[in-house]
């Protein structure tokens, strides 16, 4: 029997507002534990929540960027549950009237485009954070009340690879809107996955399991891959899939049972009595719509049509707003588009991945990389020298021309000087001359290598090849 995988993702995104969703407490990451808290966050008797209008605007902006319909009337609800990181014993959320509905994003997997539906986007407040120690737990309520949006996909995802692509695209869109930093390491983007299997051709969904503790996109992919195998094995052996919550253990690469899954009835939702419904007229919607900046798909199309970049290059450059903004700054400085793209996708990305950094954490500037690309384009430096210059400028922030002067890295293009290098290489390697005359093509490559060694990598390789062939013909 063959099974079809059905996956839906629930993504929580913290909005980077100055204050919290329903109180005036600061909503900043990294403060000392329990310092960004007030009586509203703690649910003291007699205090009342007040809706943060900026958070509502930003929730609408995110929903619009995800091609969603904005409700004219929306309300808040109480989600009742007890947990140590929830001092009020309820969370203010949205149940049956979310602010955004019926959206979608397009993803690319294996060169094909697929549309993934988005059921809803709703606003809510975040809970606090528990840190578990040996025999006790610490509670930090700084995060309590931070504005969140939860984005729930349709069960349109069929593979772990599609789930990964969906998360990448969703993160990029939210990042471009400017409403969140979407940093998983800081908790401003979190993901739960619902996954089930059903026989190929069957319309009815199978029983789903929810996966938690997915702390990176790669863990989402690995957790789903394991869960597909686990559920398939259970079903093939005649077993039954239970509706349960499981967590991904990154050390074993397996999912582990946490608890039997609750349904929405367990939370006893009811309308929030301390907040009136929100009425969102067309004028409000248009003000928010006008605030949406250029999104990744628009930039991608521009990079292909205006700058002549391949689809793949345009896709990679627009995956993060930071990289895309950097590229645009280089173009504004008249750097060659393709060379700039090659360096950002190659040398820059390699450096960032190796050092686990983001662009803003380096000393690299668009001005310096543009200068280096121009020097490379006009033949002032070779690719080999460019790599040396880049290694220095990304660490120090020095201008490429300054680095070249300090290290004597200017490419040598003077014909007489190059001819002297060629002559020295030929005099030192008579056997290579014989090999060339006997039709051995590798001899030329060897001699070019010797010339580059003599010139300490500074010889212009194009001119070297030309002069070398001329001199070989004379011998």
UniProtKB/Swiss-Prot annotation:
Quaternary structure, per UniProt, is:
Heterotrimer of A, B and C subunits.
According to the record, the signal peptide region is: none
> Is Endoplasmic reticulum among this UniProt entry's keywords?
no
- E.C. numbers: 6.3.5.-
So what does this one do? Allows the formation of correctly charged Asn-tRNA(Asn) or Gln-tRNA(Gln) through the transamidation of misacylated Asp-tRNA(Asn) or Glu-tRNA(Gln) in organisms which lack either or both of asparaginyl-tRNA or glutaminyl-tRNA synthetases. The reaction takes place in the presence of glutamine and ATP through an activated phospho-Asp-tRNA(Asn) or phospho-Glu-tRNA(Gln).
Organism superkingdom: Bacteria
Q: Name one GO molecular function term.
A: ATP binding
Name the UniProt record assigns to this protein: Aspartyl/glutamyl-tRNA(Asn/Gln) amidotransferase subunit B
**Biological process, per Gene Ontology:** glutaminyl-tRNAGln biosynthesis via transamidation; translation
Q: Which reaction does it catalyse?
A: L-glutamyl-tRNA(Gln) + L-glutamine + ATP + H2O = L-glutaminyl-tRNA(Gln) + L-glutamate + ADP + phosphate + H(+); L-aspartyl-tRNA(Asn) + L-glutamine + ATP + H2O = L-asparaginyl-tRNA(Asn) + L-glutamate + ADP + phosphate + 2 H(+)
- UniProtKB keywords: ATP-binding, Ligase, Nucleotide-binding, Protein biosynthesis
What organism, scientifically named, is this protein from? Macrococcus caseolyticus (strain JCSC5402) (Macrococcoides caseolyticum)
């Amino acid at each position: 029997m063959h099974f079809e995988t059905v996956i839906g993702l629930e993504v929580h995104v913290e909005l980077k507002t100055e204050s919290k969703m329903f109180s005036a407490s600061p909503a900043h990451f990294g403060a000392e534990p329990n310092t960004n808290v007030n009586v509203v966050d703690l649910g003291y008797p007699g205090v009342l929540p007040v809706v943060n209008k900026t958070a509502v605007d930003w929730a609408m902006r995110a929903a619009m960027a995800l091609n969603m319909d904005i409700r004219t009337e929306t309300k808040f609800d109480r989600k009742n549950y007890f947990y140590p990181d929830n001092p009020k014993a309820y969370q203010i959320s949205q149940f049956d009237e979310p602010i955004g509905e019926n959206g979608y994003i397009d993803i690319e997997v294996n060169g094909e485009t697929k549309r993934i539906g988005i059921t809803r986007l709703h606003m809510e407040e975040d809970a606090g954070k528990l840190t578990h120690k040996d025999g006790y737990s610490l509670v930090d309520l700084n995060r309590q009340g931070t504005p969140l949006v939860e984005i729930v996909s349709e069960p349109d995802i069929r593979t772990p690879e599609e789930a990964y692509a969906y998360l990448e695209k969703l993160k990029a869109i939210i990042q471009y809107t400017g409403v969140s930093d979407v940093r998983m390491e800081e908790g401003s983007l979190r993901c739960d996955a619902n996954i089930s299997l059903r026989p190929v051709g069957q319309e009815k969904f199978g029983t789903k399991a929810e996966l938690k503790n997915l702390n990176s996109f790669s863990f989402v992919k690995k957790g789903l891959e394991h869960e597909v195998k686990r559920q398939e094995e259970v079903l093939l052996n005649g077993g039954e899939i239970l509706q349960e919550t499981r967590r991904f253990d990154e050390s074993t690469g397996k999912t582990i049972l946490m608890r039997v899954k609750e349904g929405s009835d367990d939370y006893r939702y009811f309308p929030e009595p301390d907040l009136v419904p929100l009425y969102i007229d067309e004028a409000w919607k248009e003000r928010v719509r006008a605030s949406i900046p250029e999104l990744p798909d628009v930039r991608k199309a521009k990079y292909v049509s205006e700058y002549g970049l391949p689809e793949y290059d345009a896709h990679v450059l627009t995956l993060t707003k930071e990289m895309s903004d950097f590229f645009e700054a280089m173009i504004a400085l008249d750097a060659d588009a393709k060379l700039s793209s090659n360096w950002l996708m190659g040398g820059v990305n390699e450096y960032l991945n190796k050092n686990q950094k983001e662009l803003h954490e380096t000393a690299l500037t668009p001005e310096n990389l543009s200068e280096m690309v121009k020097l490379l384009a006009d033949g002032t430096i070779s690719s080999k020298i460019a790599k040396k210059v880049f290694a220095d400028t990304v660490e120090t922030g020095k201008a490429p021309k300054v680095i070249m002067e300090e290290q004597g890295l200017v490419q040598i293009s003077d014909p007489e000087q190059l001819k002297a290098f060629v002559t020295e290489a030929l005099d030192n390697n008579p056997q290579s001359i014989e090999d060339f005359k006997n039709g051995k093509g590798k001899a030329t490559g060897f001699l070019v290598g010797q010339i580059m060694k003599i010139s300490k990598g500074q010889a212009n390789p194009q001119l070297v090849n030309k002069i070398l062939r001329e001199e070989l013909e004379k011998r």
